[in-house]
Each structure stands twice: as structure tokens, then as C-alpha cells.
Amino acid sequence: MKLPKHRVPGCDIVLLVDAETGESTRNGGFRVDAGSVEAQVLHALRQRYSSVVPVPFDAKKRKTMAALHRLGPRLVFNLTEWIDGDRSRDHEITALLETHGFCYTGTSGVGLQLTRDKVKAKAAVAALGIAVPREFKSRGRRANNAMLPYPLFVKPRKGDGSDAISGAALVRRRDELQRRLDSLRARKLGPALCEEYIEGRDLFVALLGNKPQVLQPLELVVGRQGVGAPRFATRLLKHDDAYKHRWRVSYREADLPRAVLADIRQACPQIFHALKLRDYARLDFRLTADNQLYFIEANANPDLGRHTFGRERCFAGVEYPELIRRIVTAALNRDGK
């Protein structure tokens, strides 16, 4: 797709990144860290578009917006995740881009805030008739189980992906529940969400476009079992290579019954629109032994690394340059460019 004309001569695309992902150069530019997701996306963009400039997001904001107006990009490819390390403020960046009239990739502030609040997101999905784990919320100091059977899965009500998710998130008794709640409170992670634990297969489904194509579900595989083997996707499992090697963690295309695959293909676009997602996203599910599908959470800003799900398997399971091209196209088409 050809990039649209812009009223101000400038670059084709600005790659907007967190300032911590690179360093300033002597000539006033910005160099992203070699091998980073930002570097991978930048390389893919430059293979297709003639002028792509990385710009760091400065917490003071004015410097960043001045750079964007000076460059006059036809599209901002938004890879930012936080302001001053605070992920809960990512929606402020998209609001700023909208206020200044820039077309950008990815979900708007409305969708970012909705998916971050796991209670509201689950309520929106449950309203579609899609199964979600039962839950209760805990704000106080004492663990009061609202009659859900153990084990329970306890995580912050608000947060990203595997943030604060460790083996301790799975609790089997009241005393373990109390320790988990105390730990979350000590780290100031806000109210806790206590869910019934759904035993089953972890499925990850990528969606591309705004009439979203539902791509082949991927499945988490833990090749080595035994005491201490991971039962769900923790932060350690996702980001620690030694841990992944120890437990032979990998991902594969999920071999699913036709009926389950049909359920996924029907449910995912509904969830995508209900949660105000845009351009691309990832939805996480659990599938029980009797093939009951449960929605777990949505990731409005999934990792776009080339190897997110293993060697040469990006989050969508498609060829990497094609993934980046389709995200650009989706954003431009959505914005009427």
C-alpha cells in the first residue's frame, strides 16, 4: 500500500520508542539498541519504506512532539510502553498523538485502559456469552474467599501480560492466599483479582487488521515435567532463556478439534471489537480437557519481536516483514489515509 501524501514534507514513518531502548547520537538522532524489538521493527520498516526515523518518547513530551511536527510523518509506528517506567500511563501517549493529529499504529487509549483492567475486560467478554473464570476481588488485608474452590489464581487487577505473575500466583489454601495478597500489597500492585484456576492448555491467538483475521492458535508446551515444572506462563517463563531451556519450553501450532477452532474464530473478532482493539492484538485462552474454552486476557500491545514464540516465530506466526507491513496498512486504512 502506498503511503498517503502529508501536508508537511517529511519522513514516511516515525518509529516512536521508549527512550530507554537506545541512545542519542552526536548529530541529534537516536540509535535503537542492536538486537532489540525496536531494531527488528525498524529494519523491517526500512526494507519497505524509504524514510523511517526512530524518535524516543521524552517524559517531558514537548521535545517529542516538536520532533514529530518537524519530521511530519505520514504514520507513527507506536512501540512505546510507558512514561517514566509507568506502564499504566501508556494511554497518555496515544491521547497526545491524537490531540496533535497524528495517525498511529495500535490500540487507542480507550482500549489500552480497558484491557489493562482485567475485571472490566472479563465483564465485557462475558457479556458476549464467552466463558471466563469465576472471580472475586480483594482490597482489604484479610483473605476472604467468596466460595470459589481452590486452587485459585491471584494476580493484580491491573497490569500487563505476565507482570507480577510467578509460581506464587497459584494458591491452594487460605494461608497461601493470604501470603499472596500480602505480597501484592507490599509491592503496591493495587487490588488483587482472585480467579478460579482453569486447568488446561495455554493458547495464544493473534489477530491482524480491523476486520481482524484470526490466525492459527499457538500453544505453550512444557517439554519436561516434574516438581517445579511451570503450569502457566509466568514472567520467568517468558523472559528467562535459562529457565525456558531447563523446562524445554516451546510453542507450536495448536492441534485443535474443528469445533474448538470454530469457537475461537467466532469469539476472537467479537472480543477484539468489544475491547476496542485496533490493528493487531493477541488473545490468551485456556482450553480444558473437555474442550471448554475460557478467555483469560487480551494483550493490546503484544511483543512484536521476531522470536516472541521461538525461532523465527513472531507473535502472529507469519513472516516478519509481512506482519509489520500489515500493521502499517491496517493503521492507514483505519485512518482513511
Residue ranges and their predicted role:
Residues 93, 124-126, 255-337:
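ATP-dependent carboxylate activation and anion-phosphoryl transfer catalytic cores
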Residues 174-266, 289-294:
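Phosphate-binding site of ATP-dependent enzymes
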Residues 24-28, 163-166, 308-311:
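Short acidic, glycine/proline-rich loop/turn micro-motifs
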Residues 52, 103-104, 132, 152:
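Hydrophobic beta-strand scaffold residues
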Residues 1-103, 110, 140-144, 334-336:
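ATP-binding N-terminal substructure of ATP-dependent carboxylate-amine bond-forming enzymes
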Residues 13, 77, 153, 206-207, ...:
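A short beta-strand motif that forms the metal-chelation/ATP-contact edge
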Residues 2, 6-17, 68-70, 112-201, ...:
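Active-site nucleotide/adenylate-binding loops and adjacent lid/helix of ATP-dependent enzymes
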